[in-house]
């Protein structure tokens, strides 16, 4: 029988996957097959949540703006409409930061667009 000389490559591949699963508990960090399946699942989750993070932050900004605007007696929808008609170039992230950190500036902005 001839000698197979590819053992190192297979070992390297398995070791790299087991190293990726180093923080896991139980068989997921010890057994190669379980570790490989768990690694695939983890990569799927990380991809999904990278996309989901953007949606989550946008909804957080909208909620913060809505809370700040309602204190001044205006709805979020009306506020965004007024911003667009007055050609104010602040995005929702900036508006949320202003609403939280600098309330006086936010009130001045409301006076400008009303």
Curated annotation (Swiss-Prot):
Tagged with keyword rRNA-binding: yes
Which superkingdom, per the lineage? Answer: Eukaryota
Q: What InterPro entries does the entry give?
A: Ribosomal_bL20, RIBOSOMAL_L20_CS, Ribosomal_protein_bL20_C
Subcellular location, record wording: Plastid, Chloroplast
GO biological process: what's one of them? ribosomal large subunit assembly
The GO terms this record gives for MF are: rRNA binding; structural constituent of ribosome
Alphabetized UniProt keyword annotations: Chloroplast, Plastid, Ribonucleoprotein, Ribosomal protein, RNA-binding, rRNA-binding
The answer to whether UniProt assigns keyword Plastid to this entry is yes
A GO-annotated cellular component: ribosome
Q: What is its main location?
A: plastid
State the family it belongs to: Belongs to the bacterial ribosomal protein bL20 family.
Could you tell me which PANTHER family the record lists for this protein?
39S RIBOSOMAL PROTEIN L20
HAMAP family this protein is in?
Ribosomal_bL20 (MF_00382)
Q: What does this protein do?
A: Binds directly to 23S ribosomal RNA and is necessary for the in vitro assembly process of the 50S ribosomal subunit. It is not involved in the protein synthesizing functions of that subunit.
Name assigned to this protein: Large ribosomal subunit protein bL20c
Q: Which organism is it from?
A: Chara vulgaris (Common stonewort)
């Amino acid at each position: 029988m001839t000698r197979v000389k590819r053992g190192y490559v297979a070992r390297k591949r398995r070791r790299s996957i087991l190293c990726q699963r180093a923080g896991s508990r139980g068989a997921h960090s010890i057994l190669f097959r379980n570790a490989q399946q768990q690694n695939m699942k983890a990569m799927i989750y990380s991809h999904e949540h990278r996309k989901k993070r953007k949606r989550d932050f946008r909804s957080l900004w909208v909620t913060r703006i809505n809370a700040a605007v309602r204190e001044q007696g205006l709805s979020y929808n009306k506020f965004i409409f007024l911003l667009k008609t007055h050609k104010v170039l602040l995005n929702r992230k900036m508006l949320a930061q202003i609403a939280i950190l600098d309330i006086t500036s936010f009130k001045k902005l409301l006076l400008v667009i009303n």
